[in-house]
Amino acid sequence: MLQPKRTKYRKMHKGRNDGLAWSGNAVSFGEYGLKATAHGQLTARQIEAARRTISRHVKKGGKMWIRVFPDKPITKKPIEVRMGSGKGNVEYWVAQIQPGRMIYEIEGIPEDIAREAFRLAAAKLSVTTTFVTRTVR
């Protein structure tokens, strides 16, 4: 599962996930990409599940890039614990996603296989996505 090796601080403020993706919004590495069309958070588990789905569908062919990394810790208090006594422990890690953000890229396979692989992977993700093709080489 993806998570940072070390961080400066263990816990993070909730923050706001506004605006559009100004960086990481173009197909930079591969031929085809899976692009987010809504705000949301992708957990490390979701990213890994979608990666496995893509890998299984394309089998040996092609090369894949994961363009997001879960670097935000999400905390949770244990069940049946009273309020107060500080912030809970880190439960899992998420990547914050804005509309336009490229999530996965792939190359070296036909478009129909890439489209189907991304369709199957999109079912594992909590944000709506669209299939995009590289415009300029």
Curated annotation (Swiss-Prot):
- Report if keyword Endoplasmic reticulum is assigned: no
- Coiled-coil positions are none
| Keywords in alphabetical order | Ribonucleoprotein, Ribosomal protein, RNA-binding, rRNA-binding, tRNA-binding
A biological process (GO) annotation for this entry? Answer: translation
Q: Pfam families from the entry?
A: Ribosomal_L16
| Keyword Ribosomal protein assigned | yes
In alphabetical order, the GO MF annotations are: rRNA binding; structural constituent of ribosome; tRNA binding
List cellular component terms (GO): cytosolic large ribosomal subunit
Q: How does it assemble?
A: Part of the 50S ribosomal subunit.
Q: Which family does it belong to?
A: Belongs to the universal ribosomal protein uL16 family.
HAMAP family, A to Z:
Ribosomal_uL16
Its biological purpose = Binds 23S rRNA and is also seen to make contacts with the A and possibly P site tRNAs.
**Designated name of the protein:** Large ribosomal subunit protein uL16
